[in-house]
Amino acid sequence: MTVSQKGSGREALEPLLADGVRELGLALSDAQLGKLLDYVALLAKWNAVYNLTAIRDPRQMLIQHILDSLSIVPHLAPLGPSSVLDVGSGGGLPGIVLAIVLPEWTVTVNDIVHKKTAFQAQGKAELGLANLSVVTGRVESLQPGAEVPAKFDVIVSRAFAELADFVTLARHLVAEQGAIWAMKGVRPDGEIERLPAGAHVEQVIRLNVPSLDAERHLIKVVVDAGG
């Protein structure tokens, strides 16, 4: 067993996750922490066959995927129970993480790649996430009352597209008083300048991701009604 593998077993990940959650100021139950670790194990297992992520090491999965996704929770949780659409969710990030830690929220994960939504559906089943829905298809083709039940309070993406494209493709799904939230690395000032008409940035939040030495930002975009 390599040093990397020794540091990537569940017993090694537990304190890393607990410390990260504490640093983010989140209060999670033992059951929620357990589900997050189960999710890492499931992602690592499926990734060997389906190439869901370029990250292979479970420890780095925990840091770069789970803790990265958790870093937005302190900024979303104050909204209260809401409906979320995670666009281009891939392996379920951040949507599955949000469904685990915000059980009173309803979360829909979306991707156009069937093998990815198959994994998301498996995650829903194995992790017992009754508040999670999985939708396969292009976001621009999803219609409230058809492919999805209604518009969403929160539309989020972690690695979907440039900001202007994300807004253009998803704005028809934003509920009244809702917003688009884009997870980015370095502050994307150029992307912000290219936002389409009727969309403006309300907040740019510098995120702290425990154990990750890299810039992360959360961009809140508000779109005009009917845009």
UniProtKB/Swiss-Prot annotation:
Positions contributing to S-adenosyl-L-methionine binding: G88, L93, V139, E140, R158
Gene Ontology CC entries for this record: cytosol
GO molecular function ontology, one term from the record: rRNA (guanine-N7-)-methyltransferase activity
Leader sequence residues: none
Pfam families reported in the protein's UniProt record: GidB
Reaction equation(s) it catalyzes: guanosine(527) in 16S rRNA + S-adenosyl-L-methionine = N(7)-methylguanosine(527) in 16S rRNA + S-adenosyl-L-homocysteine
Subcellular location as annotated: Cytoplasm
First-level EC class: transferase
Major subcellular site: cytoplasm
E.C. number(s) listed in UniProt: 2.1.1.170
InterPro entries linked to this entry: rRNA_ssu_MeTfrase_G, SAM-dependent_MTases_sf
Entry-linked NCBIfam families: rsmG_gidB
Family the entry assigns: Belongs to the methyltransferase superfamily. RNA methyltransferase RsmG family.
Function: Specifically methylates the N7 position of guanine in position 527 of 16S rRNA.
Protein name (record): Ribosomal RNA small subunit methyltransferase G
Origin species: Paraburkholderia xenovorans (strain LB400)
Gene that encodes it: rsmG
